[in-house]
């Protein structure tokens, strides 16, 4: 099927059956339809030669027909598919020639170019293929170039080498957004210098956006990793435009959280380049400039590993020399020097870590103290550290107590016996504008304590007197942060407390009283101050002055603080046995405005005074007042105490009005307890009817299901002192009270709770005996079931638990009536027969 054979009229390829198609071609020589029909017929019935003959004629007849050319070219390509391009080189060249003929008039058809280029990619024709790609790009409009570049990039990867680099360089002019793929190719091809340049270009381009979603930091990190790992293969210098040191240092300034990694990377770069001294300089710069311990640790560990590797290699070389018997003093000296340098590096580590923390916050007092401790006995460095700390720390921003640093600085000189220098330091310290008044007060106190340790007592007193200097009437607010600590320190309680203790221990009473008086003038006294001052005067037999101090303290403080002062004051006054009228006035003052919760102890003390030194009736009136004045929590106990005192002084009958008022004043639960005590008292007096009436009154507070103990006591009382009628009356009241509680919604929940508690208590008794447990379980009903039965019952009535028993007489012993199976058991049942009989 060569070109010459196809161009001449090969009449033998035209069969008799083709006449119809040939006549159609003759009648319509410019139409494509007859040719398509002819080709289709040959595809079904003709040989490959006949098909090629017809297609060749069609393309020559209609050279601008894209459809015919595409059909013909696909036919020829399919014929060669799977055949070796080298072995059948001539056939491949024929098809290449056909593509060239087609492109003469169809050079704007991208599909033809794609077919041609794909066909060329199967052949080992690199130069021809590259030139054909270039022709395609020139022939097609730029909107169609993406179709060509897709194949061109694949060709570039297969061609590799400089061909691939140059192809991609051209591609980047059109599609700079694919720079990452280009960089990957350059790295694969070992073109590291060019790859770094491309990294720098995209990082400098603010419009570049990664197609793979990488941030600028990720791209920059990839570039740095490439620079460090391929340091020897990458050309650097001004002529190339790559300055690795400047690149990494710019990243150190820009990416604060990656400084440790970048410093280590820069050092690794110089190590890879073989410049060990430069690497050591980088390590030193890194560990002395980073701001976090994490970065420091990363750099320091890399530094140590670097030094260990060098020392290890030098030791191996020394071992080899020793084996050979060679002596190299310079090499041995270098090894010793590096060993010494390594030891020094390890010794510096705590100081370097401390430097990092102080760079983070130079106002960190705690770290400055640690630095002082690191120097141990090196006095010169300790002084330098204290001096540097005082110069660096801003008192208003200090983290920790700045005053402690000053104090420790002074103590350092004190421990060395240089008190004069220590005093100079303290004198400067008390002028520092600390964050708080407390720090300044601590400094003054420490100064005085230093003088005390040196037994300069007068000097210590003078220092505290100077610290507490203030105007006669100071209007300064201790908590006013707008004022300096020096302006407010004279109102520091800590300072005055130390001052008064000091004066009390080393000075006279008069001087001590002056200090206490000054504290009261400044109105900074605390309750403890009042007590201490009063005790001091009492020890020196100034009892009246001591009482006046308590009174001044009571003017300063209100309840609840005043309660403790009154307690002490009244106790002291009573013990001194001052006039009864004066004591009464004091107690009345104490009780005036006293909160109820603090009233009970004062009333008891007041009543006891009247009992011992006054009149019993006065004491009773005080106790009666107390029952009204104390809090609700103390009222019951106060009534009990009042009743006990009244009974002991005036007999049991005198307690009746007290009981009556207590029952009226106390809440129901406590009133019930008081009723029981009242009834027991009447019973002991033989007043049975009065006791029964009290039980009847108390019954209104006691639900039989939740207060069974009350009803048991009443029942025992009736058994001992009553008769059948009084016992029936008790039972009637019990049923009526139970009915009252059944119709009161407020008690339904409490009944349920009480039943559950009752079940828990009776659970232990059930285990004692099976028979007794069975009876108890029948009597106990579920609380919710009882409520449901009550809801279904008519209002005011409770369904009977059993059928009629033939009167109110109980069955004979041993013949207990069994409940009817059809009647539900109801523990709330009320038997009305007794009421009817009573009528």
From Swiss-Prot:
Localisation per UniProt entry? Nucleus
- Assembly and interaction partners: Associated with the spliceosome.
- HAT repeats (start-end): 12-44, 46-78, 90-122, 124-158, 274-309, 377-415, 417-453, 470-502, 507-539, 541-575, 578-612, 650-684, 686-720
Q: What is its main location?
A: nucleus
Q: Where is the composition biased (Acidic residues)?
A: 830-839
Q: Which UniProt keywords apply?
A: mRNA processing, mRNA splicing, Nucleus, Repeat, Spliceosome
Region: Disordered, residue numbers: 758-839
Tell me the first and last residues of the signal peptide: none
Basic and acidic residues compositional bias, start-end: 762-782
Tell me the gene name: syf1
The family classification in the record reads:
Belongs to the crooked-neck family.
Spell out the protein name for this chain.
Pre-mRNA-splicing factor syf1
Q: Which Gene3D superfamilies match?
A: Tetratricopeptide repeat domain (1.25.40.10)
Q: Which GO terms describe its biological process?
A: generation of catalytic spliceosome for first transesterification step; mRNA splicing, via spliceosome
What this chain does, per the entry, is described as: Involved in pre-mRNA splicing and cell cycle progression.
Q: Name one GO cellular component term.
A: Prp19 complex
């Amino acid at each position: 099927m060569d070109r010459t054979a196809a161009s001449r009229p090969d009449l033998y390829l035209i069969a008799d059956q083709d006449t119809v198609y040939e006549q159609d071609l003759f009648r319509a020589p410019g139409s494509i339809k007859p040719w398509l029909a002819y080709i289709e017929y040959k595809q079904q019935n003709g040989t490959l030669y006949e098909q090629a003959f017809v297609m060749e004629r069609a393309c020559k007849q209609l050279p601008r027909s894209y459809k015919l050319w595409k059909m013909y070219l696909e036919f020829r390509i399919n014929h060669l598919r799977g055949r070796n391009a080298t072995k059948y080189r001539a056939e491949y060249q024929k098809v290449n020639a056909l593509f060239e003929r087609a492109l003469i008039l169809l050079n704007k058809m991208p599909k033809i170019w794609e077919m041609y280029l794909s066909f060329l990619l199967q052949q080992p024709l690199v130069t021809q293929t590259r030139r054909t790609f270039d022709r395609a790009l020139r022939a097609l409009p730029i909107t169609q170039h993406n179709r060509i570049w897709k194949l061109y990039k694949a060709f570039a990867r297969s061609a590799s080498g400089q061909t691939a680099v140059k192809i991609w360089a051209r591609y980047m002019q059109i599609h700079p957004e694919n720079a990452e793929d280009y960089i990957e190719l350059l790295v694969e091809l070992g073109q590291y210098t060019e790859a770094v340049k491309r990294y720098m270009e995209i990082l400098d381009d603010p419009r570049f956006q990664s197609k793979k979603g990488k941030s600028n930091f990720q791209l920059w990190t990839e570039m740095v990793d490439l620079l460090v790992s391929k340091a020897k293969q990458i050309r650097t210098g001004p002529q190339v435009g790559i300055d690795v040191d400047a690149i990494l240092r710019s990243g150190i300034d820009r990416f604060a959280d990656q400084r440790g990694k970048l410093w280590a990377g820069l050092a690794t770069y110089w190590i890879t380049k073989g410049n060990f001294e430069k690497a050591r300089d980088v390590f030193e710069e890194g560990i002395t400039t980073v701001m976090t311990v994490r970065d420091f640790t990363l750099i320091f560990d890399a530094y140590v590993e670097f030094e260990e590797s060098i020392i290890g290699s030098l030791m191996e070389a020394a071992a080899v020399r020793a084996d050979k018997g060679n002596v190299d003093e310079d090499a041995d000296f270098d090894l010793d020097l590096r060993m010494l340098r390594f030891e020094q590096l390890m010794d510096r580590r705590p100081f370097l870590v401390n430097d990092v923390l102080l760079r983070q916050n130079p106002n960190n007092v705690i770290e400055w103290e640690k630095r002082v401790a690191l120097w141990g006995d090196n006095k010169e460095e300790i002084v330098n550290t204290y001096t540097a700390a005082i110069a660096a720390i801003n008192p208003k921003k200090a983290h920790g107590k700045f005053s402690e640093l000053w104090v420790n600085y002074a103590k350092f000189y004190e421990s060395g016996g240089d008190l004069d220098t220590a005093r100079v330091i303290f004198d400067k310290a008390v002028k520092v504008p600390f964050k708080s008044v407390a720090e300044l007060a601590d400094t003054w106190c420490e100064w005085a304590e230093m003088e005390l340790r040196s037994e300069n007592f007068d000097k210590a007193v003078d220092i505290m007197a100077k610290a507490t200097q203030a105007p006669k009437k100071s209007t300064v607010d201790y908590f006013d942060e707008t004022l300096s600590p020096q302006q407010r320190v004279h109102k520091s309680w800590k300072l005055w407390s130390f001052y008064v203790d000091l004066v009390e221990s080393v000075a006279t009473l008069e001087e001590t009283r002056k200090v206490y008086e000054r504290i009261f003038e400044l109105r900074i006294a605390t309750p403890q101050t009042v007590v201490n001052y009063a005790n001091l005067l009492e020890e020196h037999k100034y009892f009246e002055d001591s009482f006046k101090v308590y009174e001044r303290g009571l003017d300063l403080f209100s309840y609840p603080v005043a309660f403790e002062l009154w307690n002490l004051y009244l106790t002291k006054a009573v013990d001194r046995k001052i006039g009864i009228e004066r004591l009464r006035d004091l107690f009345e003052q104490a009780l005036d405005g006293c909160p109820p919760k603090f009233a009970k102890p004062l009333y008891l003390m007041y009543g006891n005074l009247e009992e011992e030194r006054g009149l019993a009736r006065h004491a009773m009136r005080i106790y009666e007042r107390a029952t009204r004045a104390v809090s609700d929590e103390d009222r019951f106990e106060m009534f009990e105490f009042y009743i006990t005192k009244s009974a002991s002084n005036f007999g049991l009958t005198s307690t009746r009005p007290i009981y009556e008022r207590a029952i009226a004043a106390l809440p129901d639960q406590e009133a019930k307890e008081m009723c029981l005590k009242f009834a027991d008292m009447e019973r002991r007096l033989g007043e049975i009817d009065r006791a029964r009436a009290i039980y009847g009154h108390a019954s209104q507070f006691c639900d039989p299901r939740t207060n069974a103990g009350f009803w048991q006591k009443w029942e025992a009382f009736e058994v001992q002192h009553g008769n059948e009628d009084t016992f029936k009356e008790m039972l009637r009241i019990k049923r009526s009270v139970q009915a009252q509680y059944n119709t009161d919604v407020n008690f339904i929940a409490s009944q349920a709770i009480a039943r559950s508690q009752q079940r828990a208590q009776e659970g232990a008794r059930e285990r004692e005996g099976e028979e007794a447990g069975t009876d108890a379980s029948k009597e106990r009903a579920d609380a919710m079931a009882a409520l449901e039965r009550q809801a279904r019952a008519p209002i005011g009535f409770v369904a009977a638990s059993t059928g009629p028993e033939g009167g109110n007489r109980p069955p004979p012993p041993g013949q207990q009536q069994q409940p009817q199976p059809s009647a539900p058991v109801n523990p709330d049942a009320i038997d009305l027969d007794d009421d009817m009989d009573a009528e």
